[in-house]
Amino acid sequence: MPPKKKKVTGLIKLQIKAGAANPAPPVGPALGQHGVNIMEFCKAYNAATESQRGMVVPVEITVYEDRSFTFVTKTPPAARLILKHAGIEKGSGEPHKTKVANVTRDQVREIATIKMPDLNANDLDAAEKIIAGTARSMGVTVEG
């Protein structure tokens, strides 16, 4: 007989800086209410995201009945990647009136390539359109 599947008791989605997870909020309270060993998660997450230090990396944590957990890291949010490539701190407060920066078509393609595993797109062109739309809604113009 195949081994019995563990029963899932919770799914937690967080956005944490890579290599900088610690038991302080928001990580501690989110995991604590599900009875997960917080330090164990922090060590595992920090080890898994060490190479992406400085970026915000979303994580999806699945908590099981026996309080064990598994987690899947995602690609950094598109908005963060756009800000990084445009070299700005934050997007425009009035995106359709005030433009704050420019990104080239090549930069959009690069971001789309990075985000491809997490995007709901069939090919790179569709992914580029999604990223360009995100850039426009942040007040960043796409050149080319």
Curated annotation (Swiss-Prot):
**Classification via CDD domains:** Ribosomal_L11
Function per UniProt: Forms part of the ribosomal stalk which helps the ribosome interact with GTP-bound translation factors.
Single biological process term from Gene Ontology:
translation
Query: What name appears for this protein in its UniProt entry?
Result: Large ribosomal subunit protein uL11
Sorted alphabetically, the Gene Ontology cellular component annotations on this record are:
cytosolic large ribosomal subunit
Q: Which UniProt keywords apply?
A: Methylation, Ribonucleoprotein, Ribosomal protein, RNA-binding, rRNA-binding
Spell out the family assignment given in the record's similarity comment: Belongs to the universal ribosomal protein uL11 family.
- GO MF, one example: large ribosomal subunit rRNA binding
PROSITE patterns reported for this sequence: RIBOSOMAL_L11
Subunit structure of this entry? Answer: Part of the ribosomal stalk of the 50S ribosomal subunit. Interacts with L10 and the large rRNA to form the base of the stalk. L10 forms an elongated spine to which L12 dimers bind in a sequential fashion forming a multimeric L10(L12)X complex.
Q: Is Signal a UniProt keyword of this protein?
A: no
Give any Pfam family that matches. Ribosomal_L11_N
Q: How is it modified after translation?
A: One or more lysine residues are methylated.
* Taxonomic source organism: Streptomyces sp. (strain FRI-5)
